């Protein structure tokens, strides 16, 4: 299986990247605790905030959350998706070791022309690992994009960063 994973460094201008980091780490941006990361009872936990969902039955209903414009608008404008399925911010906290192994997964299955982009809000020694062994390090203002059917997983950080923050964007093009 051929993996086409693209990385773009300095995806947004520096001021916008810093604004997103400052806003998402302020008291103005809520994080909701989840006692699983990928699958129910997977032994991992994280915080998240769904910023956009195309499904009526989802937590925020259909459409944009009130945080969408401040956090996502410029990202989406630059990515230029045909249709957005879901945008979710994820925050994982520091772990002592890499013993916390997040499971490989796909965000959606059977989506024609589906892509996933992960925008790294901050820098730390965590990242994203792919089924083929490729590792993308969490670096502020980097965007990694790959076909939605590629299995990937969170690699938690162990350095002195308080959190690993990403914005996960699922869409078609």
Spans of features found by a protein language model:
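Catalytic core of non-heme Fe(II) oxygenases with the double-stranded beta-helix
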Residues: 57-173
């Amino acid at each position: 299986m051929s993996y086409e994973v693209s990385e773009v460094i300095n995806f947004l201008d520096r001021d916008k990247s810093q604004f997103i980091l400052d806003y998402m780490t302020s008291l103005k941006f809520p994080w909701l605790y989840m006692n699983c990361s990928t699958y129910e009872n997977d032994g991992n936990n994280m915080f998240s905030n769904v910023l956009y969902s195309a499904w009526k039955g989802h937590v925020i209903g259909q459409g944009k959350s009130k945080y969408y414009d401040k956090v996502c608008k410029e990202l989406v404008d630059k990515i230029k998706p045909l249709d957005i399925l879901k945008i979710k911010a994820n925050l994982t906290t520091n772990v002592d070791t890499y013993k916390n192994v997040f499971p490989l997964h796909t965000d959606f299955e059977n989506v024609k022309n589906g892509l996933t982009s992960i925008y790294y809000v901050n820098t730390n020694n965590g990242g994203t690992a792919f089924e083929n062994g490729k590792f993308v390090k969490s670096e502020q203002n980097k965007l990694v994009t790959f076909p939605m059917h590629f299995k990937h997983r969170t690699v938690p950080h162990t350095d002195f960063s308080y959190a690993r923050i990403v914005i996960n964007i699922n869409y078609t093009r």
